[in-house]
Amino acid sequence: MFAVIKTGGKQYRIVANQVVKVEKVIGNAGDVVEFNDVLMVGQEGSAVIGTPVVADARVTAEILEQARGRKVIAFKKRRRQNSKRTRGHRQEFTTLRVLEILMGGSKPKKAAAKPIKEEATAAKGTKDTAVEKKAEKTAEKKTASQKKAAVASKSKKD
């Protein structure tokens, strides 16, 4: 069974257990991602073509690594103007291993990662606790009137 998926503005023909390099996908090594933009699913002799995507078709894949490609140099020069500009660029990509191609609402063998929205709210929660800790520290500091009283008591003792 093969499938054609769309990710990163490109289309890839994939089969199960294939290792493929695609444009950067959010996630860490070892995470399982799911692609819902399946344009075509086929087997020997038959194929289902989506309009634009195949309904209830999904592809699950495991992230093997997040890396950057080789450097591409962009060089501009204007002759006789003493003007030149050099820029370098390294494109980020993700290496994936396709786990399985699912049709008709079947469930994946390995659970996919949680949606990004839930992770973002969890990250915001850690910021709130940090702000509360700062607020507690500032509350412990002495006020100006307390400092004057402390200085006055020291001078009376001397």
UniProtKB/Swiss-Prot annotation:
GO terms for biological process, alphabetical: translation
Gene Ontology MF term list: rRNA binding; structural constituent of ribosome
Keyword hit for Coiled coil: no
Keyword hit for Glycosyltransferase: no
Assigned keywords, A-Z: Ribonucleoprotein, Ribosomal protein, RNA-binding, rRNA-binding
InterPro entries recorded: bL21-like (IPR028909), bL21-like_sf (IPR036164), Ribosomal_bL21 (IPR001787)
Basic and acidic residues bias locations: 115-143
Region (Disordered): 106-158
Biased segments, Low complexity type: 146-158
GO terms for cellular component: cytoplasm; ribonucleoprotein complex; ribosome
Domain of life: Bacteria
Function: This protein binds to 23S rRNA in the presence of protein L20.
Family (UniProt): Belongs to the bacterial ribosomal protein bL21 family.
Family matches, as PANTHER family: 50S RIBOSOMAL PROTEIN L21, LARGE RIBOSOMAL SUBUNIT PROTEIN BL21M
HAMAP family the record matches: Ribosomal_bL21 (MF_01363)
Subunit structure and binding partners: Part of the 50S ribosomal subunit. Contacts protein L20.
Protein's UniProt name: Large ribosomal subunit protein bL21
Species in which this protein is naturally found: Bartonella tribocorum (strain CIP 105476 / IBS 506)
Organism classification: Bacteria, Pseudomonadati, Pseudomonadota, Alphaproteobacteria, Hyphomicrobiales
